[in-house]
Curated annotation (Swiss-Prot):
Subunit comment: Monomer.
Gene of this entry: hemC
SUPFAM superfamilies, per database record: Periplasmic binding protein-like II (SSF53850), Porphobilinogen deaminase (hydroxymethylbilane synthase), C-terminal domain (SSF54782)
Pfam family, one: Porphobil_deam
GO molecular function: hydroxymethylbilane synthase activity
Function: Tetrapolymerization of the monopyrrole PBG into the hydroxymethylbilane pre-uroporphyrinogen in several discrete steps.
Sequence similarity: Belongs to the HMBS family.
Highest taxon above the source species: Bacteria
CDD domains: PBP2_EcHMBS_like (cd13646)
Enzyme class label: transferase
Keyword Isomerase: no
InterPro entries assigned: HemC (IPR000860), Porphobilin_deaminase_cofac_BS (IPR022419), Porphobilin_deaminase_N (IPR022417), Porphobilinogen_deaminase_C (IPR022418), Porphobilinogen_deaminase_C_sf (IPR036803)
Protein's recorded name: Porphobilinogen deaminase
Length: 314
C-alpha cells in the first residue's frame, strides 16, 4: 500500500478541477485510507487567451507546468484531458492509466438554432480548433468561423452576450460541468471527427516511481486505453499537434477496433479521410498504417505546407 500523501497536479480551470476530483474519488474508492493533496497549477496556455493555440505552440502549453511539477517532485501524478496530452511523452514520465471514456464527440451550443443545418448563411460560429474549423467549413462554407478561447464557462458567456450565433465545444466537458442542458446538437463523427483522446482523462507519473505506477494501474480502463492507443499512434506517425487539422477516433466493440482518421487544410479545401477495422490488439499498427495511407494520398504535402507557414511565424 502507498503510505505517503499522494500529491496530484492539476490545472486550476473548473473543468480540470472537476476531472481531478473525479479521479480522486476513483482512487479513494480503491484506497479509502489514502491521504490526497491537490496541487493546482496555472499553465502557460491558461494565461494566453488572446491568441489561438495553433499560433502559440499547441495544446502542450496546458501540460508543461504539470509535467515540471512531476519532474521536480512537487507532485506524484498529474491529471490531463487526453486530448491535451502530446502524443510523444516527456522523457522520464509515462502515462499510467486512462479512465473510462465519456462522450468523445463535439457539440453545437446555440441559443437560437438547434443544429448546424439550421444555422443561417453568414452565421458566426466560435471555435479556435483548426480541426473543427476545417470540417465545418467543408460542410458549411457559407458560415463565418471566429476565434474563441477561454474555459467552457467563458466561451458560453460570450455566446450569451451575442458575440456568436453558435459555438462548438467538447461534449464530455459540458457533461462534466453539468452543462448538458446547453447542448443543442451532438455532432456526429461523420461531420466532425473528434480530436485524439477526446472525452477521456489520463493520469501521468514518473517512470521510475514503481509504487505509484503499480497501485494506479488499477484505474486503467482497458477498452478506452486500446482505443486511444490507436488514435495516438495515428497522430504520432503524423507528428501532429493542434497546429494541424487532424482528427482520429477509434471504437472498440466485440474485440474489433474501428479507427477513423482525418487530415485537412485549415481552409477546408482539402480533407483526407481513411479508416481501418481490425483485431483489438492491432490498434497501434492500424494507426501507423492509416497515417501512412493518408501521407501517401496527399497529407504529407498539407503538413509540409503548414510547417513552413508556422516556421515563418516563430
Amino acid at each position: 500500500m502507498y503510505n505517503k500523501t499522494l500529491r496530484i497536479a492539476t490545472r486550476k480551470s473548473p473543468l480540470a478541477l472537476k476531472q481531478t476530483k473525479y479521479v480522486q474519488k476513483k482512487i479513494l474508492s480503491l484506497y479509502p485510507d489514502l491521504n490526497i493533496k491537490l496541487v493546482p497549477i496555472v499553465t502557460h496556455g491558461d494565461n494566453i487567451l488572446n491568441k489561438s493555440l495553433s499560433k502559440i505552440g499547441g495544446k502542450g502549453l496546458f501540460i508543461k507546468e504539470l509535467e515540471l511539477a512531476l519532474l521536480e517532485n512537487k507532485a506524484d501524478i498529474a491529471i490531463h484531458s487526453m486530448k491535451d496530452l502530446p502524443v510523444k511523452i516527456t522523457k522520464e514520465l509515462c502515462l499510467v492509466s486512462i479512465c473510462k471514456r465519456g462522450n468523445a464527440l463535439d457539440s453545437l451550443v446555440s441559443n437560437n438554432y438547434q443544429s448546424i443545418n439550421q444555422l443561417p448563411k453568414g452565421a458566426i460560429v466560435g471555435t479556435s480548433s483548426l480541426r473543427r474549423q476545417c470540417q465545418l467549413i467543408t460542410y458549411r462554407p457559407d458560415l463565418i468561423i471566429s476565434p474563441l478561447r477561454g474555459n467552457i464557462e467563458t466561451r458560453i458567456a460570450k455566446l450569451d452576450q451575442g458575440k456568436y450565433d453558435a459555438i462548438i465545444l467538447a461534449t464530455e466537458g459540458l457533461n462534466r460541468l453539468r452543462l448538458k442542458n446547453r447542448i443543442t446538437q451532438i455532432i456526429p463523427a461523420e461531420l466532425s471527427l473528434p480530436s485524439c483522446g477526446q472525452g477521456a482523462i489520463g493520469i501521468q507519473s514518473r517512470l521510475h516511481d514503481k509504487k505509484v505506477l503499480f497501485f494506479l494501474s488499477r484505474l486503467n480502463h482497458i477498452n478506452t486505453f486500446i482505443e486511444i492507443n490507436a488514435e495516438r499512434a495515428f497522430c504520432r506517425k503524423l507528428e501532429s499537434g493542434c497546429q494541424i487539422p487532424i482528427g482520429s477516433y477509434a471504437i472498440l466493440k466485440k474485440n474489433k477496433i474501428w479507427l477513423r482518421g482525418l487530415v485537412g487544410s485549415p481552409n477546408g479545401k482539402i480533407i483526407l479521410k481513411g479508416e481501418r477495422i481490425g483485431c483489438y490488439n492491432t490498434g497501434e499498427k492500424m494507426g501507423y498504417s492509416l497515417a501512412d495511407e493518408l501521407l501517401k494520398n496527399g497529407a504529407k504535402n498539407i503538413l509540409n505546407n503548414l510547417h513552413i507557414k508556422q516556421s515563418y511565424c516563430i
